[in-house]
């Protein structure tokens, strides 16, 4: 707070604006209590009440529907975090920038940061004291270089900034894929297999930021995922596992803040990725962790050398924090499963768990392989027996029964399972063999169609790499709910549909339904 500027009081007004993770407040240019021209030189202000402080980005308006002359309008995130009723008088002053920003500037200049400096930055991030611009500055500074000690300090600070779970079991397993592959909903098959065996697997997952579905978005089609800490513990106690949204239990909140900025800017460096994943797994109380690194031309990791470097980073951090970490590389050349988008991916998962004859074989096989690795952490299971045990649990229906138990424990979903009513097909332009699939382009196309906000939007794949196709045969179908999304997706597919048949792009269908 600036001591030379007097504070004034304004009444809280709730402004129904979704400003993402950033706190934003609005004052009137004709404010009776505050002179807007004085505040114009300050990008941030402090709201204070009974020891509670909220830092927010300031906007000035001429619209009385956002803030009257005696009011300060709080965006939805700011209103939720300040947690005071509409009409409450609060003190408003220009904000002093967080002291930790000096360390951010030092990092940009090339200095190595101490553990205390990194801890201060993460603490301020976790309390939403940074604007998106300041977050980007930290990410850019860290992207230039980060030492091993800084990586460990960053991981530890992020893990300690939120909820830290402790479990009574000596072995608590978990798995994580670094992402980038459409579909690939293996966690929703692996968790019930491992839980049915008896190993605890408390799986917390993220929502999509730049992809058409995260595990939490897909699980939400089947069950409630906004579960609190105590309820999560009760579910794991009764079911040996869960599939919930990690943001609701406040695991590594600073990481969620960083991800919200770094993903859209494509600033996801190897070190930041490792710190992000490991901080959440450490905070979740996992003792044994399996990391899946898909490798492919349009995946996050494109080659074996890059995958090896990433593996060593995961193993290094895991060792320093006393965790057993196993890293495997998998085929990242194409989507896993037939669906891209929450409802379509949930359908794939339930088909695999139900041993449906039309279930995607790639999703089934990859899930069995991953589950096998985790099951072999059970000291009572002899070495090499993991795959057979995983297949037994899946084929017998035990995994499906366990999934239903988890769904019942988490509570019913309120989401529709209907697919988008509008659709169009992408068809092969000529006879041949599917030679390549662009994962990144399909992800973008599914998002353009409305996923994950519209859970029934997305893409259903009919052909994979190596499949023979005839001219005019559908390669995939795009689903949307609204005409604008349908038309945007059709235009995007016309510009590049993500499939190559004998090295040539397919052409979009002229017909739509």
From Swiss-Prot:
The keyword Transferase applies. It comes from the Bacteria. Keywords: Glycosyltransferase, Transferase. The keyword Transport does not apply. Disulfide bonds: none annotated. GO terms for cellular component: cytosol. One of its GO terms (biological process) is pyrimidine nucleoside metabolic process. NCBIfam families: ARCH_P_rylase, PRK04350.1. This is Putative thymidine phosphorylase. It comes from Bradyrhizobium diazoefficiens (strain JCM 10833 / BCRC 13528 / IAM 13628 / NBRC 14792 / USDA 110). The lineage of its organism: Bacteria, Pseudomonadati, Pseudomonadota, Alphaproteobacteria, Hyphomicrobiales.
């Amino acid at each position: 707070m600036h001591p030379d500027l007097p504070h004034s009081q304004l009444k809280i007004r709730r402004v129904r604006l979704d400003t993402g993770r950033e706190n934003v407040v609005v004052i009137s240019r004709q404010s009776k209590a505050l002179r807007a021209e004085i505040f114009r030189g300050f990008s941030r202000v402090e709201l204070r009440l009974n020891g509670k402080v909220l830092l927010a980005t300031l906007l000035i308006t001429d619209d009385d529907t956002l803030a009257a002359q005696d009011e300060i309008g709080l965006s939805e995130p700011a209103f939720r975090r300040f947690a005071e009723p509409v009409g409450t008088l609060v003190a408003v002053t220009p904000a002093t920038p967080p002291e930790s920003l000096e360390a951010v500037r030092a990092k940009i200049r090339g200095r190595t940061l101490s553990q205390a400096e990194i801890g201060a930055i993460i603490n301020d991030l976790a309390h939403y004291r940074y604007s998106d611009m300041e977050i980007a500055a930290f990410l850019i500074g860290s992207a230039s270089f980060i030492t091993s000690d800084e990586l460990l300090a960053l991981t530890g600070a992020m893990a300690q900034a939120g909820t830290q779970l402790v479990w009574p079991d000596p072995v608590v397993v978990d798995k994580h894929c670094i992402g980038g592959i459409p579909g690939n909903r293996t966690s929703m098959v692996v968790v019930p297999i491992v839980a049915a065996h008896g190993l605890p697997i408390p799986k917390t997952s993220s929502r999509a930021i730049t992809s058409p579905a995260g595990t939490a978005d897909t699980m939400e089609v089947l069950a409630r995922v906004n579960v609190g800490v105590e309820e999560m513990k009760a579910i794991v106690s009764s079911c040996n596992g869960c599939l919930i949204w990690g943001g609701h239990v406040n695991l590594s909140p600073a990481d969620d803040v960083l991800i919200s900025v770094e993903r859209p800017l494509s600033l996801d460096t190897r070190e930041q990725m490792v710190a992000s994943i490991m901080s959440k797994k450490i905070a979740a109380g996992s003792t044994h962790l399996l990391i899946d690194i898909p490798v492919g031309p349009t995946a996050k990791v494109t080659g074996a050398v890059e995958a090896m470097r990433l593996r060593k980073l995961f193993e290094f951090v895991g060792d320093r924090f006393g965790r057993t970490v196993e890293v495997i590389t998998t085929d990242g050349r194409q989507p896993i499963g037939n669906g891209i988008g929450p409802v379509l991916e949930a359908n794939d998962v339930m088909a695999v768990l139900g041993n449906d004859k039309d279930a995607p074989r790639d999703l089934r096989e990859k899930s069995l392989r991953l589950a096998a690795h985790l099951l072999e952490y059970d000291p009572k299971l002899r070495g090499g027996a993991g795959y057979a045990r995983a297949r037994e649990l899946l084929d017998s229906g035990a995994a499906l029964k366990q999934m239903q138990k988890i769904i019942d424990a988490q509570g019913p979903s309120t989401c529709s399972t209907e697919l988008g009513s509008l659709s169009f097909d992408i068809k092969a332009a000529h006879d041949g063999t599917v030679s390549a699939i662009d994962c990144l382009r399909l992800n973008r196309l599914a998002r353009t169609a409305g996923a994950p906000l519209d859970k029934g939007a997305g893409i259903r794949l009919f052909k994979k790499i190596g499949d023979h196709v005839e001219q005019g045969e559908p390669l995939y179908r795009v689903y949307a709910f609204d005409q604008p999304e349908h038309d945007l997706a059709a235009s995007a597919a016309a510009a590049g549909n993500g499939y190559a048949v004998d090295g040539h792009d397919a052409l979009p269908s002229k017909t739509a339904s």
